[in-house]
A protein has these predicted regions:
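Substrate-binding cleft of secreted/luminal carbohydrate-active enzymes
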Residues: 260-308
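Substrate-binding cleft and catalytic face of glycoside hydrolase catalytic domains
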Residues: 47-65, 73-194, 242, 259-261
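Acidic-and-aromatic substrate-binding clefts and catalytic sites of carbohydrate-active enzymes
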Residues: 33-44, 60-73, 100-101, 140-142, ...
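Aromatic- and acid-rich polysaccharide-binding/catalytic face
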Residues: 50-57, 131, 137, 185-191, ...
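Aromatic-lined carbohydrate-recognition surfaces of secreted/lumenal glycan-active proteins
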Residues: 25-27, 31-37, 132-135, 167-201, ...
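Short, acidic/polar
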Residues: 36-48, 113-123, 198-211, 268-275
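Bacterial N-terminal signal peptides that target proteins for export
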Residues: 1-8
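Boundary/entry segment of secreted carbohydrate-active catalytic domains
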Residues: 23-57
Length: 325
């Protein structure tokens, strides 16, 4: 009879430790699986994710609410976490028509442009190793362009050239500035509803192709805030294919799904997540939170309960990703 060299309790302890340090869900996979990083999402973050995108800490209005006074602390935390743990760091976001400093709204256009360049230069100097830079967020008509609708919209669209002959001159100029200040960083655009709605996919494609003509864009961002009863997989896959026709890699930047019941959430994840994860153009998926306190709290998008237990969708996600290349 073979004698056990180590007590059973020691063997079990070793197994538990190995499980605890097994690494992120997508470790060793062909795609990155990450999450937004914020105080409510920070607990055990590195256990599951190998991508890190700050939720609000990188928005201009969060950093420079008072002109010339830079609050880098929360953004430093997200960036340093990524670098310490060899995670992909995606900067969210350079320019957006929301959560912008209110002081920029009433500046003359030439001063607004100078302020934008100062903002870009400050980011580039402090964070030299950004992997992916979301230059402009939600640029499509009717989304969140930096116009004068609200006090925090920025009102600097004209300072970047307005809509102009292309309809998106300001977006092109934003990317020209980004290429100047981030010459070694992969630049991306980001928007929502671009897989769900054909017209928005085509508008997005138009902007992207104009950026490509000047070699200003390196990746496409698709937010991925989906509804369990949203447009069909076939519709969304066709729009993914349309955007993939550019030859650019695609990143799902803010993925979440409603799930007021475990069964509803699980079914939605099983229906929609593989559509993205298995698409050949998609290089990564970032969730827009996974714990309570995330943006779609009321819709039940969280994957971990208050007591720390996993909802079935997260258990399924681990198994599904493990089964894929």
């Amino acid at each position: 009879m073979l004698k056990l060299r180590y007590p059973l309790t020691f063997v079990l302890l070793l197994g538990a430790c190995a499980s605890a340090v097994a690494g992120p869900i997508a470790a060793g996979k062909q795609r990155v699986l990450g999450s937004e990083y914020s105080p409510s999402q920070s607990k055990d973050f590195t256990n599951d994710w190998d991508g890190d995108v700050p939720e609000n800490a990188g928005k201009w209005g969060s950093v420079e609410a008072v002109r010339g006074q830079m609050n880098w602390g929360p953004l430093d935390e997200a960036y340093q976490l990524a670098k310490r743990n060899h995670m992909q760091f995606q900067f969210h976001c350079g320019l957006w028509g929301a959560q912008q400093p209110t002081w920029v709204r009433n500046l003359p256009p030439n001063e607004q442009r100078a302020a934008i360049e100062h903002w870009f230069a400050a980011i580039a100097q402090r964070y030299p190793d950004i992997d992916l830079m979301q230059v402009a967020n939600e640029t499509l008509p009717g989304h969140n362009q930096p116009d004068n609708r609200r006090a925090d919209s920025g009102n600097y669209l004209r300072a970047l050239g307005g809509t102009g002959a292309t309809g998106v001159d300001w977006v092109l100029e934003a990317f020209r500035l980004a290429r100047k200040y981030f010459p070694h960083t992969k630049l991306m655009i980001n928007d929502y509803n671009v897989t769900e709605y054909n017209d928005q996919a085509r508008q997005y494609l138009h902007t992207i192709q104009l950026l490509q003509q000047e070699h200003l864009i390196d990746a496409i961002g698709i937010q991925g805030h989906l509804s369990s009863n949203g447009p069909s997989v076939s519709v969304q896959r066709a729009n993914l294919d349309l955007l993939a026709s550019t030859g650019l890699p695609i990143y799902i930047t803010e993925f979440d799904l409603d799930g007021r019941t475990d069964a509803q959430q699980l079914a939605a994840w099983q229906r929609f997540f593989p559509m993205f994860w298995e698409h050949p153009a998609v290089r990564g998926v970032n969730l827009w939170g996974f714990r309570h306190g995330l943006w779609r709290e009321n819709e039940g998008a969280y994957l971990i309960n208050y007591d720390g237990s996993e909802r079935p969708a997260l258990t399924w996600l681990r198994s599904y990703v493990a089964s894929r290349p």
